[in-house]
Amino acid sequence: TTPEPITLHRTLAAAKANRITHAAMEASSHGLDQRRLDGVTLTAAGFTNFTQDHLDYHHTFEAYFDAKAGLFARVLPDNGIAVINIDDPRGLDMAAIAAARGQEVITVGRDGGDLYLSAQRFDSTGQDVRFDYKGKAYTARLPLIGGFQADNVMLACGLVIACGADPARVFETLPHLGTVRGRMQLAATRDNGAAVFVDYAHT
């Protein structure tokens, strides 16, 4: 989750002191609601999805959506770039909030967008994907299991491009990605070729 403000700012200050120029972090709905990110200057921010998680905290879908929308309505500066997954039913609502602030919006999705997933083929150790960005196709091997991984990678690519990276170089790095421990992590391959995974995800 998003650290409390003092820890967050201390961590970012230490990163800057160590000449780290870029950072990525989660902007959790709890953290946004509790204003833990206030005062952090962001270049870009992304919206992945809106599900029924965390209703124990927010109580209503409206309050939960408003908390997430705070990332674009309050935290991301007017000159920031919003990367929005428009496959999610609330994606266009979030894009409208960002656009109303004057933020540049980059849309991502499987069914179209500025950056979209146009092909995907799975095997036992990962997937081959094709992304299209601004009329150009980029193919890559993702050593990650699960269709959702391509969705997450697509949004992450949008964020990195929004921060000024060359798109071709962004897509060239994808084969070097590693999985998060415990999230569809390839643990072993049996003698018969069957893959064994560890997965603690619970959405």
Predicted regions and their residues:
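Short, conserved glycine- and acidic-residue-centered signature motifs
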Residues: T1-E4, Q149, T203
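Conserved Walker B
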Residues: S28, F50, A201
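Conserved nucleotide-sensing/catalytic segment adjacent to the nucleotide-binding pocket
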Residues: T1-S28
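Charge-dense, low-complexity intrinsically disordered segments
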Residues: T2, L55-H58, A201
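Acidic, Mg2+-coordinating active-site environments of NTP-dependent enzymes
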Residues: A17-I20, A24, D33-L37, L42-V196
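Conserved cofactor-binding/catalytic machinery of classical short-chain dehydrogenase/reductase
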Residues: T7, L155, H202
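Short, glycine-rich nucleotide/cofactor-binding loops
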Residues: A195-T203
